[in-house]
Amino acid sequence: PPEDELRKFIGPPLQEQFMKCCEIEEKEAAEMVGLYREYYQEKGIFDNWVYEGVMEMLKTLKEAGLTIVMATSKPEKFAKMIAEHFGFAKYFDLIGGACMNGARTKKQEVIQYVLGQCEEKDLEKIRMVGDRCYDIEGANREGIRAIGVLYGYERRTGGSGS
């Protein structure tokens, strides 16, 4: 499929996106997610990169004494492997992601999980940085200020998801 079609699968829960885009039932979508994850774990997991300036930013924030956590829609297991592989896990106090069993798949659920694990409870001191509309919407639903970035997959839509 064309790249713009594949981009629709980045961000939202995969099973929901398969059902929507492929017009299939839940069971078939779950099977497709399983097949995708098999491929991803073997071949696709490290087929990405760290954007320029991100490592330096993480280092600066960590040296300033900030607590840095990750809330990703990617399965937590994969997120931790990627963070280790690319050398930025050391900057994070917590890496939280989706559950492989489907119990925590929506961005808001991941954010709730991460917030529950954080020592900081004052939402005024917490910021969500994201490159997809799902990041911004999830943060807004939890009462967290969000910072949208344009270097990721959302491109120049301003986080609208359009």
Positions of predicted regions on the chain:
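Structural recognition of alpha->loop->beta junctions
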Residues: F86-G96, T157-S162
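A short, structured active-site edge motif that brings together acidic residues
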Residues: G34, A89-R104
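Acidic, Mg2+-coordinating phosphoryl-transfer loop and its flanking beta/alpha structural elements
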Residues: R127-S162
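Short acidic capping loops at alpha-helix termini that bridge into adjacent secondary structure
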Residues: P1-E5, E26-E28, K90-L94, D122-I126
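N-terminal helical cap/lid subdomain that shapes the substrate entry/recognition surface
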Residues: P1-M55, K77
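Surface-exposed amphipathic alpha-helices with a cationic face
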Residues: M55-E63, L115, I136-N140
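Substrate-recognition element of Asp-dependent hydrolases with the DxDx(T/V) motif
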Residues: M57-A83
